């Protein structure tokens, strides 16, 4: 398993458009990858707690657990993701943060 965590800083004036776009563009990719056994679990979370808040932004945590490291590469090479990523970049204020690696322990997945 490989776990990826991304924190996005979405401008307060773009929250509705971002959430709508995420449902329209990214959610179908997750469903496709889960159906193919590539993705085990994924969540989009609006953060209430952050040690690094961004002024003028609502922060979101994207958490994805792939069956293996190839899932992350398949996702990032998917043309649907690349199209959504260009749209989503317009909603962000400031840099996001991305983390990932081999999952060491897991409960429930």
Model-predicted regions and their roles:
Residues 2-11, 41-81:
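Short, well-ordered beta-strand segments in beta-rich or mixed alpha/beta enzyme
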Residues 38-59, 82-109:
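Glycine-rich beta-strand-turn "strand-cap" elements at beta-sheet edges
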Residues 14-44, 82-85:
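Short amphipathic alpha-helical segments
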Residues 1-2, 24:
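A generic alpha-helix surface/boundary motif
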Residues 29-34, 66-70, 86-91:
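Glycine-rich loops and low-complexity Gly/Arg-rich segments
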